[in-house]
Amino acid sequence: ALLQSIWDSTDGETYLPFRETGYDDVLEPFDMFYLTSMMDAQVTTLSADRAVRTGNVPVVNGSAYHPFGVDVVEGPIEGSSAAYFDGDFPPLPTGNTNGPMWHHSLAHNLVLEVPEAKMMAYGYLLSGVLVDYCDPKCTFEGDW
């Protein structure tokens, strides 16, 4: 329990409720881009959904998936934004089990090779603006 409480204080999600307003004079408001790959066993869709909801982060319209309760916005988006990419990977196991990491690590890693994802990520890092390069949706052919 002690180690978990130490870990929790360093987890980025701890700061998401303060993304828009900051916290006293300790934390300034901040922006972020959340790039997510569907069926990722390392950073699950549930975790990504929770992060964008907690941080009140809009999802670009071309995203392959639009989480419940999150604003869907036409690009370009200035400031915080998110995009979900889908490589058509098989579903993750349900319940409290984990799928084979060699398989679902591909969902985590291969999205970084998708040209649209690269342009979105690097463009956001350079300008703070997310341009929706997905036409019509953020999908790719995952090589698994």
Q: What is each stretch, according to the model?
A:
Residues 1-144:
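C-terminal subdomain of alpha/beta-hydrolase-fold enzymes, centered on the catalytic histidine
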